[in-house]
Regions:
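C-terminal core of ALDH-fold dehydrogenases
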Residues: 137-245
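Short beta-strand segments
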Residues: 12, 24-27, 48, 57-59, ...
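Glycine-rich nucleotide phosphate-binding loop and flanking beta-alpha elements
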Residues: 7-8, 31-33, 39, 152, ...
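Glycine-rich, mobile lid/loop segments that gate access to catalytic sites or pores
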Residues: 7-16
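Short coil/turn connectors at secondary-structure junctions
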Residues: 5, 18-22, 26-27, 42-44, ...
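ALDH superfamily catalytic-core signature
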Residues: 30-131
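Short acidic active-site motifs
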Residues: 7, 128-131, 153-154
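Short, small-residue-biased leader/transition segments that mark boundaries at the very start
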Residues: 1-3
Length: 245
């Protein structure tokens, strides 16, 4: 167990010097993610984070030099990272693959890039733009770039994505380091039901109920009926004693 895993446990249970916390958030390697998953329930967590991933949609107007660079920016994270591109143009696909081979030669994490691109990467060619939308919503990627002539037309069509980057001058590393939105994002398809970390992640709600006597009496028969159907007679009795009193 590495120091970071121990830190997760220390925060969840508390120590003589560290007070117990209610929620643990933030990215980490597979060991940190596993520690957070094991401790979910003891504390709340932001999400179950897996390896980094990117889906790029590119039409015939995209620049293969940029596309290759952006795919590798995620592939370099680790050997389990996923970098997938879908394009409407066979020419763009071929040129992007050539650029990956050219650019990776001078990158420091070439071995990791080569492994992740070979095992978890893909370049898909489809003339059907709707297929790209369908694929995106099924994969629910952590990051997605739309590099197309009119990228904003895809807003509202792609629902399941952690962070959406629009246009050739909005590369994924912009979101990692500078743009502003939190880049702790759902991975492994969990963008179907998880959202990026945000201020609302640190807010919890409670319910408040206050009935008058008349309001409770109006609802009493309905509550008693439901409780008795469930054979929870003490529930029903809690209402009956007030109705009778």
């Amino acid at each position: 167990m590495c120091i970071r895993d121990r830190a997760v446990a220390a925060l969840a249970y508390g120590t003589e010097e560290i007070p117990r916390v209610s929620k643990i958030v933030g990215p980490g390697n597979i060991f940190v993610a596993t520690a957070k998953k094991l401790l979910y329930g003891t504390v709340d967590i932001d999400m179950f984070a897996g390896p980094s991933e990117i889906l790029v949609f590119a039409d015939e107007t995209a620049n293969p030099v940029y596309l290759a660079a952006d795919l590798m920016s995620q592939a370099e994270h680790d050997k389990l990272a996923s970098a997938i591109m879908i394009t409407t143009s066979m020419d763009i696909a071929v040129r992007t693959q050539a650029e990956i081979e050219r650019q990776s030669a001078y990158l420091s994490r070439k071995d990791i890039i080569d492994y992740s691109m070979t095992n978890y990467g893909a370049i898909i060619v489809s003339e059907d733009k709707d297929y790209a939308i369908e694929l995106a919503n099924k994969l629910a990627p952590e990051h997605m770039e739309v590099v197309a002539e009119n990228p904003t037309e895809y807003i509202g069509k792609i629902d399941n994505v952690g962070s959406l980057f629009l246009g050739q001058y909005s590369p994924e590393p912009l979101g990692d380091y500078y743009a502003g939105p939190n880049h702790v994002l759902p991975t492994s398809g969990t963008a179907r039901f998880f959202s990026p970390l945000g201020v609302d992640s640190f807010v919890k709600r409670s319910s408040y109920i206050c009935y008058t006597k008349d309001a409770l009496l109006d609802a009493a028969d309905d509550i008693i009926l439901i409780a008795e159907r469930e054979k929870l007679t003490a529930h029903a009795n809690s209402i009956k004693v007030r109705k009778e009193g």
